[in-house]
Amino acid sequence: MKLSMPRFDQAPVLVVGDVMLDRYWHGGTSRISPEAPVPVVKVDQIEDRPGGAANVALNIAALGAPASLVGVTGDDEAAESLTNSLKAAGVLARFQRIADQPTIVKLRVMSRHQQLLRIDFEEPFRTDPLALSAEVYSLLDGIKVLVLSDYGKGALKNHQALIQAARKRGIPVLADPKGKDFAIYRGASLITPNLSEFEAIVGHCVDEAQLVTKGAQLMQELDLGALLVTRGEHGMTLLRPDQQALHLPARAREVFDVTGAGDTVISTLAAAIAAGEELPHAVALANLAAGIVVGKLGTAAISAPELRRAIQREEGSERGVLGLEQLLLAVDDARAHKERIVFTNGCFDILHAGHVTYLEQARALGDRLIVAVNDDASVSRLKGPGRPINSVERRMAVLAGLGAVDWVISFPEGTPENLLTHVKPDVLVKGGDYGVDQVVGADIVQAYGGEVRVLGLVENSSTTAIVEKIRGQG
């Protein structure tokens, strides 16, 4: 399955559910308490992050999709912290505030990136389901997907009314279920239980075949459009009526913290479906996103640039021949890893030893080397009739096979100035015996603080000489 980045900016999503605040106390620990055999943590940083349904909305907004949120909080400092964080992220949050109940807070005590203790401040909310539903109904006409983020804390008490209201409007409903009564999600377009939640409903599954069988039965019983079971290190399994099961392996390179991974899955799914993606593609994107977020500490969101870079890696475009959009993503990724970008350009009509030596020297000036190649029409204008000898596709394919070259791109103009304006390399390199001020594009690179280098040519190595020799022998 070929992955691509959806147009999230045209994908409004509404999240309804249990809102909470994830609070982190960070500090160092170097001794054991004399009062009890527990570590003493000297807190030096306090951090608040939206959690639960608020984290789902935050993830959707981080992908670039318009996100709205309806939930329940107390009327307290934690609710203010949530409101401010969500507003800063561009989330439209509408909270039903309960004056005599606290906002749900999950407090984690952290030291050296390890969680030492979690303290929960919560009690089930006594909410007015009709008031909450009215808030949801007022927002339904402006959205493309409805998400029910259910943590069983009391915000969601009228699942069926919300599902039916959305279905009447043709709006898909995605639910992240909790509890032992999945009947409340009847008629949903997709539910996303993890394996333990799924098995709590259908019983233990001895293998994938049994998981598929029991999942199909559950979909039929609950009139579900689809079922996605998230299975940790075993990936995900997507089930749809009358279609073959789709198993996706886990994508995490390193698992650092699984907090909020389920939120990332349903938020990416919702945004992708709202953007018009087919369900298998949306699930593949969600699987990719989950693999990224578990590599972060604590409740975290995945950004659009992070997902784009992951798609690029998945599609094998970390190296090779790229278009401009792909190249800019690759450059952004390299810069995120503090890599130095080197740029050179030329016709490279017949690749010879001089070219190889020159490109190796250019690559040694940084971490990544971009080679921009004149297209065929451009070469013909520069070199005259009969050139190029090799088409631009062949020239780029040969260059991409060199160990010194990371990315190859073609350009139609006589000079690479347009590319330089977009890419902004750290180093612009040319081969020749002229001064830096004579290098085309030097002024562009130097204007933003980049470096321009001129490398000497290898003697007795010339494409023109090779072409003339071949023609003379012909």
From Swiss-Prot:
The active site is at residue 263. Gene3D superfamilies: 3.40.1190.20, HUPs. Pfam families: CTP_transf_like, PfkB. It catalyses: D-glycero-beta-D-manno-heptose 7-phosphate + ATP = D-glycero-beta-D-manno-heptose 1,7-bisphosphate + ADP + H(+); D-glycero-beta-D-manno-heptose 1-phosphate + ATP + H(+) = ADP-D-glycero-beta-D-manno-heptose + diphosphate. The keyword Phosphoprotein does not apply. Pathway: Nucleotide-sugar biosynthesis; ADP-L-glycero-beta-D-manno-heptose biosynthesis; ADP-L-glycero-beta-D-manno-heptose from D-glycero-beta-D-manno-heptose 7-phosphate: step 1/4; Nucleotide-sugar biosynthesis; ADP-L-glycero-beta-D-manno-heptose biosynthesis; ADP-L-glycero-beta-D-manno-heptose from D-glycero-beta-D-manno-heptose 7-phosphate: step 3/4. Coiled coil: none annotated. GO terms for biological process: ADP-L-glycero-beta-D-manno-heptose biosynthetic process. Its EC number is 2.7.1.167, 2.7.7.70. Disulfide bonds: none annotated. GO terms for cellular component: cytosol. Catalyzes the ADP transfer from ATP to D-glycero-beta-D-manno-heptose 1-phosphate, yielding ADP-D-glycero-beta-D-manno-heptose. In the N-terminal section; belongs to the carbohydrate kinase PfkB family. In the C-terminal section; belongs to the cytidylyltransferase family. This is Bifunctional protein HldE. It comes from Pseudomonas syringae pv. syringae (strain B728a). The gene is hldE.
